[in-house]
């Protein structure tokens, strides 16, 4: 018993009736105090104010003031009888809310005029002041409610507490009608509305999380690189897959189709990497090992003492698509006419020039070194080399042509090398020029102009009329000033070989760019596989120099062999050190060549897997410079070689000599010369031995002629060609008991003998030879259009009116390197 304190919440046993000592009633402490009520139909009654320990019947009493805690009324427990049938109850015990946070607030205390809300069990309710009036016995519907976060503000029925599994359970009693029912509905509607808002917020949160996950996934997704550099040690299959944004399984599949087995962790050589990258249209550059000479790039300027560094002129490379005006721009700056001396008006080698002019700002003498690169697609490696040795790149775009494939490639080279770019929109004086369209295409290619809020400066120029050239030079000097270019002229010279060739009188000649230090006559120079003591230094005009400071391109004589374009050079203290360095490079190169040869043999084995083999054409290539040799080899690789294979026996710069002719005679090779001369003794030997020798000065002509020679070795092929078509107009009996078709030629001509097809409703009924045609009563060999004739066949006579006869003739054609699309 408890006569004072907090209200008592009785336990309810819903399984069976029992008796217990009743507890005295309590007076509510406030109108909002919680007072659980259990309503169970019962025949007997107990005095008002008593509380039973289990489900019992309460008889409504006359309205009277509630009892006070000071004068409790104690009564004996009353044994109650259960009704004939247990009350119907709907209970859901899935979720049990916390006891300290009830879902529904307690109803106001029972008082006069409020008894209607708690009328007899199942009563009508709503009869204020006459609680218990409705004495109809109806089973109460007890529901277990799902907790609501916002339910604390809603009005509803009182909740009961029940021990369930050691936790408090909230039991809601659903009224059956009256004002209580209306309040319960109102509270439930508010809860449902709050729940709908909560679900909507949760759904929005889920969508936001999904969008964030997608953004992170896209940001982390691998992007295909446009240019891949491969060192002498090769790359693993997994590394190739990462750079191509594919799976290692894709790389393994490509190699498997070529007859090469591989694994994701396996390292493959440069040749196999190129096969995979060609499949996905990605360019591959072979880089030398980054120790020894190649590692000197890391020593440029960075290892020098700060007080020894001085400002140096900028090195500017001009790049862009073919015929967009790169060389014309350089002509105007140099005040020369280089284009007039180039074959077909296109640049086919790297040109390096040192230009002196008055500064556009203060008129002081200013120096800039320019490098002009080819725009033809065959000179990809030259453009890549130009991008790696430059400080600033000028991307020339024609205003009437826009961004072209080689323009995009040049942009990719500059981005890969991290070189700042200045865009020169050329030919603004021509009809059809549209600079705005060019800037839009540049933005799509990843270069947003400064005028549009980007970081790439653009200058509108006309290389022929000189419009905008002053502004372009100012932009170059401003960009160089921001870059703060410095070098140490007191250090031994280091730099890059821009171009090299073999001169018949002077020997190997190398065009080099000094990037740090000063190159002097008499220095011992090493360039990977070659070395030598510098005998002479000349500028682009042929003037002799005693020394070459940083950022100056010069020609060097004295090397023992022609170096490869792109090689790094360095000055050593003695010839012994130079020889040791070259020997070390040769050993490394041999190891790499063994791996390359093994890969090449696997590819050739795959080409001959059908047992038929390929016809091989041997070629000896002689070019003016090593860069041209590199470009022509790349161009010849683009020719289809599924039917005939090109094999380069020798590819080197220099004129055609007697030894070249003897090598061609012993190997059965064709000699190709590009911008070279032929020694007189070699010319006489070529005529005597009958060697095929062709020389060119334009790379387009060389590639086209080689394609024609390759197709000539394939021979002719017989191809069926449609000659005519006829329609069967009548069917009649022939003398030999067979049926003959009376036909009208509707297109072309019918020829005998020839191969024909008989079609009925586009379905082929017969394919075979037509040996005889009759015109009236005469045998003829040919019938033209709109002419009637008779046709009889030895193996077919199921003619019907409306049948079509298609006649084919055989045509002899030159076999092509690749199949002609249908």
Curated annotation (Swiss-Prot):
Locate the region G4. 426-429
The coiled-coil regions, if any, are none
User: Cystine bridges: which residues?
Assistant: none
Question: Annotated region G5: where?
Answer: 462-464
Ordered alphabetically, the record's keywords are:
Chloroplast, GTP-binding, Initiation factor, Nucleotide-binding, Plastid, Protein biosynthesis
A single GO molecular function, which one?
GTPase activity
Q: Where is the signal peptide?
A: none
Residue ranges, annotated region (G3): 372-375
Q: What's this protein's name? A: Translation initiation factor IF-2, chloroplastic
Q: Which organism is it from?
A: Euglena gracilis
């Amino acid at each position: 018993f408890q006569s004072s304190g907090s209200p008592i919440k009785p336990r309810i046993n819903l399984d069976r009736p029992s008796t217990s000592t009743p507890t005295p009633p309590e007076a509510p402490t406030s109108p909002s105090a919680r007072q659980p009520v259990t309503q169970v139909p019962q025949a007997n009654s107990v005095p008002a104010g008593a509380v039973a320990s289990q489900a019992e019947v309460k008889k409504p009493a006359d309205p009277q003031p509630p009892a006070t805690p000071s004068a409790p009324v104690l009564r004996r427990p009353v044994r109650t009888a259960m009704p004939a049938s247990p009350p119907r109850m709907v209970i859901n015990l899935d979720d049990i809310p916390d006891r300290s946070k009830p879902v529904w607030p307690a109803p106001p205390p029972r008082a006069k005029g409020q008894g209607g809300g708690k009328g007899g069990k199942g009563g009508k309710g709503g009869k204020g002041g006459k609680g218990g009036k409705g004495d109809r016995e109806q089973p109460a519907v007890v529901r277990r409610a799902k907790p609501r976060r916002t339910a604390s503000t809603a009005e509803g029925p009182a909740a009961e507490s029940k021990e369930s599994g050691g936790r408090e359970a909230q039991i809601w009693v659903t009224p059956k009608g009256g004002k209580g029912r209306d309040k319960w509905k109102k509270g439930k509607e508010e809860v449902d509305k709050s729940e709908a808002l909560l679900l909507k917020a949760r759904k929005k949160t889920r969508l936001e999380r999904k969008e964030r996950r997608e953004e992170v996934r896209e940001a982390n997704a691998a992007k295909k690189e446009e240019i891949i550099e491969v060192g002498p040690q090769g790359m693993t299959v997994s590394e190739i897959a990462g750079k191509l944004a594919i799976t290692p399984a894709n790389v393994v599949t490509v190699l498997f189709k070529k007859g090469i087995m591989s694994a994701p962790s396996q390292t493959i050589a440069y040749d196999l990497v190129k096969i995979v990258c060609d499949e996905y249209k990605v360019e591959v550059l072979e880089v030398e090992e980054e120790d020894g000479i190649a590692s000197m790039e890391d020593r440029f300027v960075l290892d020098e003492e700060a007080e020894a560094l001085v400002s140096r002129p900028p090195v500017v490379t001009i790049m862009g698509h073919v015929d967009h005006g790169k060389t014309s721009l350089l002509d105007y700056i140099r005040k020369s006419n280089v284009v007039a001396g180039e074959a077909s008006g296109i640049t086919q080698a790297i040109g390096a020039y040192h230009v002196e002019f008055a500064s556009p700002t203060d008129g002081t003498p200013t120096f800039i070194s320019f490098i002009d690169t080819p725009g033809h697609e065959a000179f990809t490696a030259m453009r890549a080399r130009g991008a790696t040795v430059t400080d600033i790149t000028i991307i020339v775009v024609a205003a009437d042509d826009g961004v072209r494939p080689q323009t995009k490639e040049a942009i990719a080279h500059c981005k890969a090398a991290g070189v700042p770019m200045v865009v020169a929109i050329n030919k603004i004086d021509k009809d059809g020029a549209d600079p705005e369209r060019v800037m839009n295409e540049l933005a799509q290619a990843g270069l947003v102009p400064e005028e549009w809020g980007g970081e790439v400066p653009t200058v509108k120029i006309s290389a022929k009329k000189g419009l905008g050239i002053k502004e372009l030079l100012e932009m170059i000097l401003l960009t160089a000033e921001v870059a703060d270019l410095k070098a140490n002229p007191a250090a031994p010279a280091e730099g890059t070989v821009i171009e090299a060739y073999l001169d018949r009188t002077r020997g190997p000649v190398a065009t080099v760019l000094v990037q740090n230090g000063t190159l002097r006559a008499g220095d011992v120079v090493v360039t990977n596989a070659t070395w030598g003591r510098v005998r002479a230094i000349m500028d682009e005009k042929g003037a002799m120099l005693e020394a070459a400071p940083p950022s100056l391109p010069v020609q060097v004589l004295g090397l023992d062999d022609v170096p490869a374009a792109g090689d790094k050079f360095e000055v050593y203290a003695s010839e012994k050190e130079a020889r040791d360095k070259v020997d070390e490079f040769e050993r490394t190169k041999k190891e790499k060549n063994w791996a390359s040869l093994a890969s090449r043999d696997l590819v050739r084995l795959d080409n001959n897997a059908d047992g038929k083999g390929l016809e091989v054409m041997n070629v000896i290539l002689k070019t003016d410079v090593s860069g041209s040799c590199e470009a022509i080899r790349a161009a010849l690789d683009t020719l289809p070689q599924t039917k005939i294979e090109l094999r380069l026996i020798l590819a080197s710069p220099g004129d055609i000599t007697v030894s070249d002719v003897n090598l061609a005679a012993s190997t059965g090779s064709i000699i190709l010369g590009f911008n070279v001369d032929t020694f007189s003794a070699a010319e006489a030997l070529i005529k005597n031995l009958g060697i095929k020798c062709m020389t060119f000065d334009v790379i387009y002509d060389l590639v086209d002629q080689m394609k024609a020679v390759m197709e000539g070795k394939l021979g002719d092929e017989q191809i069926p060609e449609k000659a005519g078509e006829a329609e069967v107009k009548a069917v009649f009996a022939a003398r030999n008991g067979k049926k003959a078709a009376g036909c009208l030629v509707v297109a072309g001509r019918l020829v005998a003998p020839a191969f024909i097809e008989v079609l009925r409703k586009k379905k082929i009924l017969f394919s075979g030879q037509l040996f005889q045609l009759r015109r009236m009563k005469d045998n003829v060999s040919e019938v033209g259009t709109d002419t009637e004739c008779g046709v009889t066949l030895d193996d077919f006579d199921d003619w019907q009116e409306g049948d079509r006869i298609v006649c084919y003739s055989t045509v002899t054609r030159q076999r092509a390197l690749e199949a002609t699309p249908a």
